Curated annotation (Swiss-Prot):
This protein is located at the 30S-50S ribosomal subunit interface and may play a role in the structure and function of the aminoacyl-tRNA binding site. PROSITE patterns: RIBOSOMAL_L19. This is Large ribosomal subunit protein bL19. The keyword Ribonucleoprotein applies. Keywords: Ribonucleoprotein, Ribosomal protein. One of its GO terms (molecular function) is structural constituent of ribosome. GO terms for cellular component: cytosolic large ribosomal subunit. Belongs to the bacterial ribosomal protein bL19 family. Coiled coil: none annotated. It comes from the Bacteria. It comes from Pseudarthrobacter chlorophenolicus (strain ATCC 700700 / DSM 12829 / CIP 107037 / JCM 12360 / KCTC 9906 / NCIMB 13794 / A6). One of its GO terms (biological process) is translation. InterPro entries: Ribosomal_bL19, Ribosomal_bL19_CS, Ribosomal_bL19_sf, Translation_prot_SH3-like_sf.
Length: 119
């Protein structure tokens, strides 16, 4: 398995920010339509991360025009242009699947506050 590990290590991204479930992300995705390509931003909160290494994925959920939309991205995929962390969420679970059933203010995620002293 050491040969597979070295092949996998060559295809890992190094520009992935640290994020976890509950964080709000902007995922910039390259969309190819025929000969044209454009970057589309998908903004939502992270439901969870699965897997490890080159097979690692994360699921982002947003509500668009009253309809919940979930999209699962491979972390090390070449179609992802960049990942931006907008806010850090204060949650106590690794998987937020219960958020699918919540509506309105109940579906709000508290923002994690940073208590480091600013000097």
């Amino acid at each position: 398995m050491h040969i597979l590990d070295s092949v996998d290590a060559a295809s890992l991204r190094t520009d992935v920010p640290a994020f976890r479930a509950g964080d709000t992300l902007k995922v910039h995705v390259n969309i190819i339509e025929g000969k044209n390509s454009r970057v589309q931003v998908f903004q939502g909160f992270v439901l969870g991360r699965q897997g490890d290494g080159v097979r690692e994925t994360f699921t982002v959920r947003k509500v668009s025009f009253g309809v919940g939309v979930e999209r699962t991205f491979p972390v090390h995929s070449p179609i992802i242009d960049k990942i931006e962390v907008v806010t850090k969420g204060d949650v106590r679970r690794a998987k937020l699947y219960y958020m699918r059933a919540l509506r309105g203010k109940a579906a709000k995620i508290k923002e994690k506050r940073d208590f480091t002293s600013a000097k």
